[in-house]
Amino acid sequence: MDHLDLTQLTTCVSDLAAQSSSLAAKCHQIDTNGASRTMDKVSPSLAREILQLKESMAATAGKLQRMVQEPPDFLQRLAHQAQLLACIQWLAEFQILAFIPLDRSVPIEDIAELASVPKEHLSRIVRLTATAGFLQEPPSEMGHVAHTPLSTQFVTELSYLDAAMFLADLAAPTALQMTKTTKRFGQSPSPSHSAYNMARGTAAPFANMWDDHSIKLRRQWPAYLKHVVNSQAKSSSSDLLESLGCMDRLQGAIQCIVEVGAESAERAILLARRYPSAQFAVQLSGPAIPGGVWTAGPPDQAQKEVLIAGRIDVSRRAVGSPQPISEAALYILDLSISSLNLGQPKEHVSAELRAHLDILRLNRNSALVLISFILPDTRTGSLEEETMTSLRELCMLQLHNQQLLSFKELSELIHNTNDRMGHLSVVREAFSGTRDAIALEIHYQAHSV
């Protein structure tokens, strides 16, 4: 506190007050019929504005907290986060959240009996999570427990709970093995010399997770990527596609678009609504998982109107295998929302470039669009954006012992994909605002004579 900048403090407080007023005004526009809680009846534009205001408020509040914190505050917050993670893991393991009704409070004793857990343990855990807005013990009903808007979403959208369990069961224990990993393996580049290997006591790299028989783990990993590591990827990758201009050819045309190595059909569904004449082929990554192609990521809503009335075909295709669709207008390889290439970024990209080389040579009107996170050449984003970049980098290091590719490395991989007649070439590029993601439009180019 000795070096507190009063000017910055005043500005920060004013910003937070202004953002709070704006959010309150936006919320007053929402009907009082329950839509304010679920956001399910709010117009997309208003929902987007409210989300942006919430994110701005969280960023400003975080900045204010960092300005005034003392070492004990920092340590107490660390301890609180550690206990919060442990409590949510406990609640999930004993399915406590599912036992609590969404619309009313119930005695803690009843829930403890249903879940066969000690009442005293449950009571203490609820009191801790309630400090973070997750579950509550209503003041007028001591000894009762009820959901909050936050905890409710972990029941209605189970992928949030899957992400939390991956964090508790694997990501956090793995992160805590970094010290031992460095002492034992030093700068070894081997995917088998990661913090993940130390935490799990295995020599198999994290990429072999797909060979694991744990359906739960293979469901939790995509959820963790979606909600934690790549939380902004879908919107940013769609923005990059638009910025690149490669979607213009779809307006009013009967064209085929192939999404290579997808996690689900969600983006194809969005594009199918926007381009009603286009056909889509979604090629899911990874091996088949019991439960069908949707296990790794939703649709539903009657499988999104039976995949927009037949214009979307979903199949599985192994990385680098021959591309069975030879006359598509666009092949979209979006690494920004994939499973971080399963720890083999260069091998993954090279294999897919090679698999599409002949197709692009034989059909010069076709393009491959590659979207990927990259190592930013500069660090000019907000603290929140810096945080996400660091999370991705550490996730790659701890789980895979790998790192993201730089723009230069990515460009070289593309240019070096060649045959006797020519090579792949980047014809257009678009960077994200923070330059930590890029979209590249790739065509086949004949060798110069």
Curated annotation (Swiss-Prot):
<dbReference type="GO" id="GO:0005634">
    <property type="term" value="C:nucleus"/>
</dbReference>
<keyword id="KW-0539">Nucleus</keyword>
<feature type="DNA-binding region" description="H-T-H motif">
    <location>
        <begin position="108"/>
        <end position="127"/>
    </location>
</feature>
<keyword id="KW-0805">Transcription regulation</keyword>
<protein>
    <recommendedName>
        <fullName>Transcriptional coactivator GME11369</fullName>
    </recommendedName>
</protein>
<dbReference type="InterPro" id="IPR036388">
    <property type="entry name" value="WH-like_DNA-bd_sf"/>
</dbReference>
<comment type="function">
    <text>Transcriptional coactivator; part of the gene cluster that mediates the biosynthesis of dibenzodioxocinones such as pestalotiollide B, a novel class of inhibitors against cholesterol ester transfer protein (CEPT).</text>
</comment>
<keyword id="KW-0804">Transcription</keyword>
<dbReference type="InterPro" id="IPR029063">
    <property type="entry name" value="SAM-dependent_MTases_sf"/>
</dbReference>
<dbReference type="InterPro" id="IPR036390">
    <property type="entry name" value="WH_DNA-bd_sf"/>
</dbReference>
<dbReference type="GO" id="GO:0003677">
    <property type="term" value="F:DNA binding"/>
</dbReference>
<keyword id="KW-0238">DNA-binding</keyword>
<feature type="domain" description="HTH iclR-type">
    <location>
        <begin position="78"/>
        <end position="148"/>
    </location>
</feature>
